[in-house]
């Protein structure tokens, strides 16, 4: 019975949000008239990407080093060790919030890894280019970084359309399009940040950017991959890990993993 009274740590996160829901003056917000009941807001939050970003930020900030390394390695497809979690706000001045704010950032020695989380929306060519540019700027600030990796995590079955079009299901095609736009000095980007880059950057800078497009490793996976990595951590430890089990429960509650994964929770 006592176990049933102990909530998952992710529920504690939502409880904290509920506190601000009932006391908005604590964050300088005025009360709104006739708000929807909290449970309706909670149900809505389970469909949003931002709370999931927060939860995964907390998980990777608090989890053990080995778990962090193995999960990031599983997502990127690259064996990585010593990966440190870096809050996005720590690099905003270098990257520029107008460019992009990576969902998850990890760094270890010569390697930098970005993880982009998708729940309901798709990514696009501009967002890919902005991640490449973020890597270029961070490498300029931290010369020890030699390799940049990007993992995009989406719902099962959406891997082929995560860039908004099946024509980019092949990463090589995605890279080729980005490079051609850079080398042809195209201004046909969609985002203000990339339009500004195309307008203000020299031909040499654009060539360097095109080289970075070629060099970045990109992998698109579903949340099943993350869940499988977490399941592996549970099997490895042989005992209950509240952080891992809580995150798996969150992915299941959000219906981000397929039935083949959820029945192992």
How should each PLM-predicted stretch be described?
Residues 1-265:
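Charged, terminal alpha-helix-loop-beta segments
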């Amino acid at each position: 019975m006592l176990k049933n009274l102990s909530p998952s740590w992710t529920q504690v996160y939502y409880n904290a949000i509920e506190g601000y829901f009932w006391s908005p003056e604590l964050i300088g917000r005025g009360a709104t008239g006739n708000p929807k009941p909290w449970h309706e807001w909670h149900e809505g939050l389970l469909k949003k990407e931002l709370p999931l970003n927060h939860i995964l930020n907390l998980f990777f900030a608090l989890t053990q080093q080995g778990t962090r390394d193995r999960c990031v390695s599983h997502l990127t497809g690259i064996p990585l060790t010593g990966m440190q979690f870096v809050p996005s706000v720590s690099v905003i001045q270098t990257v520029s919030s107008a460019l992009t704010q990576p969902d998850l950032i990890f760094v270890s020695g010569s390697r930098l890894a970005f993880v982009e989380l998708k729940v309901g929306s798709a990514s696009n060519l501009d967002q890919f280019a902005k991640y490449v540019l973020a890597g270029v700027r961070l490498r300029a600030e931290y010369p020890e970084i030699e390799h940049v990796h990007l993992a995009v995590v989406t719902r099962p079955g959406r891997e082929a359309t995560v860039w908004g079009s099946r024509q980019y299901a092949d990463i090589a095609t995605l890279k080729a399009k980005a490079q051609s736009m850079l080398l042809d000095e195209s201004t046909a980007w969609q985002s203000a940040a990339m339009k500004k880059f195309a307008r203000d950057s020299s031909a040499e800078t654009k060539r360097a950017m095109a080289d970075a497009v070629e060099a970045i490793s990109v992998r698109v996976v579903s949340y099943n991959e993350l869940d499988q990595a977490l399941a592996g951590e549970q099997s490895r430890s042989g005992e209950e890990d509240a952080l891992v089990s809580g995150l798996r429960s969150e992915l299941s509650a959000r219906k981000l993993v397929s039935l083949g994964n959820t029945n192992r929770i």
